[in-house]
Amino acid sequence: MLHKNATATRGPLMPGDPSWGEFIERLAGPEACNFHTDGWTCFGDLRFTTRILGEMGLDEPSIDASTASFKGRGGYCDCEVIFNVDHPT
């Protein structure tokens, strides 16, 4: 199911992609990590990342390629995707 403001995306989602900002906004927002509060939610896995990518129209191979790339950049869980992939040191 596509998010109401999303367009279908083919291939993996990477930093610099036109949909990257929407992805990070959703991952950091109340439907996922919820960084807009005093604490945040992270289960130590990529459950929110995977769900949001699917809702944005990525198929399973594209999600797998995206998450493999995120792990290669230090994004082994949802919050690390934001800290390490979106804002590398």
Where in the sequence are the language-model features?
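Short, compact, well-ordered microdomains
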Residues: 60-89
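Secreted/processed peptides and extracellular or luminal domains of membrane proteins
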Residues: 39, 48, 83-85
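Surface-exposed polar/charged interaction patches
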Residues: 26-33, 55, 59, 73
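Folded, disulfide-stabilized extracellular/luminal domains of secretory-pathway proteins
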Residues: 50-53
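Residue-level detector of bioactive/disordered segments in secreted/extracellular proteins
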Residues: 35, 44, 79-81
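Generic detection of long, well-ordered alpha-helical segments
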Residues: 39-43, 56, 60
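Basic, alpha-helical nucleic-acid-binding regions used in initiation and control of genome expression
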Residues: 44, 48, 65
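Propeptides and adjacent flexible N-terminal/non-core segments of secreted
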Residues: 1-42
